[in-house]
Amino acid sequence: SRLEVCPAGCALSQDIALRISTHGGAALFIDYGKDRASGDSLRGIKHHQFVSPLQSPGRVDLSVDVDFASLKAAAEALKIDGLNVYGTVGQGDFLKQLGIETRLHALLTQPGITEEQAETLYLAYHRLTDEEEMGTVYRAMSMVSMPTGGEYEESPPAGF
């Protein structure tokens, strides 16, 4: 059994939480990863193909899944009043909540759009949202700082 830990990622998550709680605002994280630690996700990528991470040192891009659960736990461990962490949600659901289907329809019904342009738009939509493509592999998480004692309702940001 293997365990991946990213102390720098947890520290960065806490730094972002402190900054937005001090100055107000929100943060949005989108990347490929999991809602929990996944063990061994280290992989090499060369010419858009997965290869051994030890193949051709210095010439292979190294990549790991983001452990969103650790980032969320690190921010929540600070117990900051008014800081809320939302997600994760799959990229497909996130984009659909934001209206990607409405946007696609608007683009597809523009006067003068060619079949080739329409196909390109649909394929891009499919790649971003489909469960077999990037729709569930990529995840979204948000941190939002809401003033305490204000008139704001605690509700998740758009997409969550």
Give a label for each model feature.
Residues 1-160:
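Long, Lys/Arg- and hydrophobic-enriched amphipathic alpha-helices
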